[in-house]
Amino acid sequence: MAEKRNIFLVGPMGAGKSTIGRQLAQQLNMEFYDSDHEIEKRTGADVGWVFDVEGEEGFRDREEKVINELTEKQGIVLATGGGSVKSRETRNRLSARGVVVYLETTIEKQLARTQRDKKRPLLQVETPPREVLEALAGERNPLYEEIADVTIRTDDQSAKVVANQIIHMLESN
């Protein structure tokens, strides 16, 4: 890959966007960004706190601004928040400014990967996690599919294997 295109990872929580993104950036010698981490850096608070204080709408506004700013960069790998695709503006930006890779996974894998993680505000509710994840999948999966240039299933694969698949698919296009 001569020219370094931006690579934007989308998908549900627990799909491996951050882990795979770091691996991919390392293998391609590109800068890695995580939109949730960038929000935490700017606010000085974790995502859960921002959600609690500002609500989901306030969080999504911050997320949209961060993603807009990061997509202006060149040659980066960006792991987006699972709900970032709810914003049409964000979907349009991601599509226009890089290659969008949808990391797909099952509800079972999401449950296994997120069960002990207390930094998932949408799972810190009374509703059973499976019901929350199923509702989010129904709402968001069509949005991931809408903007995906490449879709890769991450269920039982290591970050390195998935990163290699992404690189191979990008080189083929």
Swiss-Prot record:
Positions that bind substrate: D36, R60, G82, R140
Entry's EC annotation: 2.7.1.71
Positions contributing to ATP binding: G14, A15, G16, K17, S18, T19, R120, Q157
Reaction(s) catalysed (UniProt annotation): shikimate + ATP = 3-phosphoshikimate + ADP + H(+)
GO molecular function: ATP binding; magnesium ion binding; shikimate kinase activity
CDD domains reported for this sequence: SK
Co-factor binding details: Binds 1 Mg(2+) ion per subunit.
Cellular localisation: Cytoplasm
GO cellular component: cytosol
One Pfam match: SKI
EC top class named in words: transferase
Known pathway: Metabolic intermediate biosynthesis; chorismate biosynthesis; chorismate from D-erythrose 4-phosphate and phosphoenolpyruvate: step 5/7
Principal localisation: cytoplasm
Binding residues annotated for Mg(2+), in chain numbering: S18
PANTHER family, alphabetized: SHIKIMATE KINASE, SHIKIMATE KINASE 1, CHLOROPLASTIC
Similarity section: Belongs to the shikimate kinase family.
Stated role: Catalyzes the specific phosphorylation of the 3-hydroxyl group of shikimic acid using ATP as a cosubstrate.
The protein, known as: Shikimate kinase 1
Natural source organism: Enterobacter sp. (strain 638)
